């Protein structure tokens, strides 16, 4: 495999891996800092599309970077939560949804279907507390655009909470649309999802996703994503908090890690698999903690790939995360293979 230098202004990470595989080991820590001078042409970012020296670096492994002249950020205009860049914001002024909830509601055994462009099946606003049980949720649209609005703000996600709490239990979520995340928590949204199967088929369609400071708690999920830039456990600008316990999380698309972290994410007792990407990517001032998790990644051997590590910590200049030290810890579970952590 052709190896290239990872392009970044500053890359700093703290790594803690202990008790991996069948043979337990004492936890170790390491800190790495890399600075590349401006007189060498930047190499592509992990799993990004390559370019010649006249082109901008490729995209990060999950989610497209915003344009540097646009500088999109969470709508409060501040630094956002962990992983939130500074700068101004261009969040949507409204969202489209088939079923929009602004008052407290509980429903059981219903089906929610969305076929419109960049439209959600379920949307939670105005501080509503909504519980959906034993549900079926389908999101299908050939006209959806995906892109930054889907990655940063949740546009077109099957289930989206922007202000209020959403509890999902015992359901099935399927999306076949660009930008069709399974479950998305943004801003003042709080999502709890359990005992649910989530399948996404198109690009920019994470399984469970937080951004803009959202909060999401997941337990015993079966998640499969198939598109590019579609991590099974995904976060983006503005970060947030995600806690995952149990379940299987599989990403099959190119440039789609099992976990893409621009937030504070904790995962316990889960199986994490990326079939065409590094298993874990942590960007900037953010953290990922794994306990008793199996971890598997697989980067195809071709000259477009910068590295073949299972776990990568890096800093891009896209503005998708605040510049700072990435933190990764792994206690128990299976050892990252074949090459560990970069």
What is the meaning of each model-derived region?
Residues 1-11:
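Positively charged n-region of N-terminal signal peptides that target proteins for export
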């Amino acid at each position: 495999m052709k190896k290239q230098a990872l392009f970044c202004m500053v890359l700093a990470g703290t790594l803690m891996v202990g008790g991996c595989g069948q043979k337990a080991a004492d936890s170790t820590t390491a800190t790495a800092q890399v600075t590349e001078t401006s007189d060498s042409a930047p190499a592509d970012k992990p799993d990004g599309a390559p370019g010649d020296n006249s082109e901008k670096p490729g995209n990060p492994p999950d989610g497209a970077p915003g344009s540097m002249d646009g500088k999109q950020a969470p709508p409060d205009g501040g630094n956002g939560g962990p992983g939130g860049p500074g700068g101004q914001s261009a969040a949507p002024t409204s969202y489209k949804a088939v079923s929009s909830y602004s008052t407290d509601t509980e429903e059981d055994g219903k089906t929610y279907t969305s076929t419109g462009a960049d439209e959600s099946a379920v949307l939670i606003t105005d501080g509503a507390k909504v519980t959906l049980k034993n549900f079926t949720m389908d999101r299908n649209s050939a006209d959806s655009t995906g892109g930054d609005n889907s990655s940063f703000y949740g546009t077109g996600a099957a289930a989206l909470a922007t202000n209020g709490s959403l509890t999902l239990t015992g359901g099935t979520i399927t999306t076949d649309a660009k930008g069709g995340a399974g479950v998305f928590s943004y801003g003042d949204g709080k999502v709890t999802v359990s005992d649910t199967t989530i399948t996404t088929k198109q690009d920019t369609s994470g399984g469970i996703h937080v951004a803009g400071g959202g909060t999401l708690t997941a337990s015993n999920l079966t998640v499969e994503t198939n598109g590019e830039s579609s991590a099974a456990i995904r976060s983006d600008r503005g970060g947030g908090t995600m806690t995952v316990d149990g379940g299987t999380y599989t990403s099959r698309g190119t440039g789609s890690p099992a976990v893409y972290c621009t937030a504070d994410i904790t995962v316990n007792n889960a199986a994490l698999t990326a079939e065409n990407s590094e298993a874990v990517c942590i960007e900037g001032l953010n953290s990922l903690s794994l306990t008793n998790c199996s971890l598997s990644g697989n980067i195809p051997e071709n000259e477009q790939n910068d590295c073949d590590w299972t776990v990568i910590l890096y800093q891009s200049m896209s503005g998708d995360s605040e510049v700072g030290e990435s933190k990764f810890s792994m206690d128990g579970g299976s050892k990252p293979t074949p090459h560990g952590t970069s």
